[in-house]
Amino acid sequence: MRPLCMTYWWLGLLATVGAATGPEADVEGTEDGSQREYIYLNRYKRAGESPDKCTYTFIVPQQRVTGAICVNSKEPEVHLENRVHKQELELLNNELLKQKRQIETLQQLVEVDGGIVSEVKLLRKESRNMNSRVTQLYMQLLHEIIRKRDNALELSQLENRILNQTADMLQLASKYKDLEHKFQHLAMLAHNQSEVIAQLEEHCQRVPAARPMPQPPPAAPPRVYQPPTYNRIINQISTNEIQSDQNLKVLPPSLPTMPALTSLPSSTDKPSGPWRDCLQALEDGHSTSSIYLVKPENTNRLMQVWCDQRHDPGGWTVIQRRLDGSVNFFRNWETYKQGFGNIDGEYWLGLENIYWLTNQGNYKLLVTMEDWSGRKVFAEYASFRLEPESEYYKLRLGRYHGNAGDSFTWHNGKQFTTLDRDHDVYTGNCAHYQKGGWWYNACAHSNLNGVWYRGGHYRSRYQDGVYWAEFRGGSYSLKKVVMMIRPNPNTFH
């Protein structure tokens, strides 16, 4: 049954192919051509009978030839299978070639990727080396920065130590000079006392025995300035360095009056003080510029001051003087507070003394200056006073007038600064740069307590001379400077 069905299927297939192509169609391949020739030659022949298989003859209508066609069912099936196998082989070959090409492409990619991977590994290695080198350089830079900071700190410490040593040396030199002055004053005092004793002895010999010797005025200066009595007063009220240094210098001016003990009209004698200030001494008849004993109101503090009675209109109390550079003004806070120097030469009266003087009334300030060519100028301020030490002696100034230019108002309202007390508005200590004590701002338009340089123009790392910026500038050290105060009843602020 199955062979018969297969035979029908193949015959139908051949009939369809033959109807589609026709007898005039081109024959492709040798096997198809021989098959068609066999059909045409034997179309009227019967196939040989075989004892195993049965054959059938179908008559398929043709366009030109009519009749039955006998087809061998074996041979077309074999040819078709061969064609199918060839197509499959070709497909397999093509697939193999395609896969071979893909494999070659993959091998090339693998080779390229392998090179890239090796390059990436090399770059990573170089990157690690570079990072390590950068880290080393960074650490070296940090060590260098730290070393420089340490060196800068050590240098700053050395500079501070040098400054302190210099200040100590200058203080020792100043103390040595003060001791020399003390010795000279003591020698002068001993000589003067010897002369006074001799004069008294001579006077006693001239006075008759029956006539009582007239008594000297009760407030005579020798009684005030004798060392025992004066030392007791000073020990009670003050230990001012200036007072202890200069207490022996007031006696010589009074020596000429000592022989006149026989003059009886005591009502004409001048009061010997102490006075409230130099103006009161002038009003009491003391018109000579000299050292006077002053006791401000509201305090028991006695102080010796230089009174300038010649500068019009007189009555000026000198609080600072610079004239020859004999005194070092680069001092600490306590020294500036108590005062230092020589009252008849370069000296600073003392912040505490200035405070008590200026707070007993309205005072004005006069600053006289002279350069090295002899030119003299002045600056006057209508009011001048200091706050107490709790306010670090803050400066209070009034209105300016004069011909020197205003270089002090910029310091108004500022606290006093020394090398060991920094109260200025600058980030550092202005006293270290200006080499003095002053009411520094940031830092100074005037520096009258600076270094006294000879000749005017000076060379220094900082502007540390005795200068008034509006008069000759900050790089010019003035020859003479005097700061003095006087009561001003018509004070206006």
From Swiss-Prot:
Glycans are attached at N164, N192. One of its GO terms (biological process) is blood coagulation. It comes from the Eukaryota. It comes from Mus musculus (Mouse). Pfam families: Fibrinogen_C. The keyword Secreted applies. Residues 1-19 form the signal peptide. Residues 269-489 form the Fibrinogen C-terminal domain. Induces sprouting in endothelial cells through an autocrine and paracrine action. Widely expressed in heart, tongue, lung and skeletal muscle. Also found in lower levels in kidney, epididymis and testis. This is Angiopoietin-related protein 2. One of its GO terms (cellular component) is extracellular space. The keyword Metal-binding does not apply. Disulfide bonds join C278-C307, C430-C443. The lineage of its organism: Eukaryota, Metazoa, Chordata, Craniata, Vertebrata. Its main location: secreted. PROSITE patterns: FIBRINOGEN_C_1 (PS00514), FIBRINOGEN_C_2 (PS51406).
